[in-house]
Amino acid sequence: MDTVYIQRTAGWFKPALALIICLAAGGIQSFAQSQDDVTVAFLYNFARFIEWPPGSFTSGEAPFTVGFVGRPALAEKFARAVQGKNVGGREFNIRNLDDVSGATACQMVFIGEEGQTSAVLAAINGKPVLCVGEGEAFLAAGGMIALSRAGARLVFDVNPGAITAATLSPGEKLTKAARSVKGG
């Protein structure tokens, strides 16, 4: 009798396990999508909470340009999210940067490709460009705002010293909302 019970269990176990694996995979994809949505919201708010110095734009009508190094799908999602919105009266212009030299023409750059961090930071050194990346090591490398996960939440850390070195002014809202403020 016990053998029959085990055989019946084995009959539903494999399909149930397959269903659980499929649901978990969908949950992982959903988590990644929701993390991208939060990243988009963070980037939009970073643009609002930083002050750029006079002369940061080529003209009074120039757009607010956001460059993405790596993560083209995130760039597309950001472009859709900010369509019809502006920051400081300026429309958004979204660019995928294949060459890091294009970063100097942006007001904000998101580095989604770890191998490019040093090159982008060198290209924008001393220029009024907000540089956002991922992971705590990003700040240690000279980045300005680093996104990272804390459990299921996406959080950010701020390096105000790097921000002010770029002649930008971090707003109080930015530093208060950060998980931590490092480097000055």
Describe the role of every protein-language-model region:
Residues 2-19, 26-184:
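Short hydrophobic alpha-helices and adjacent helix-cap/hinge residues
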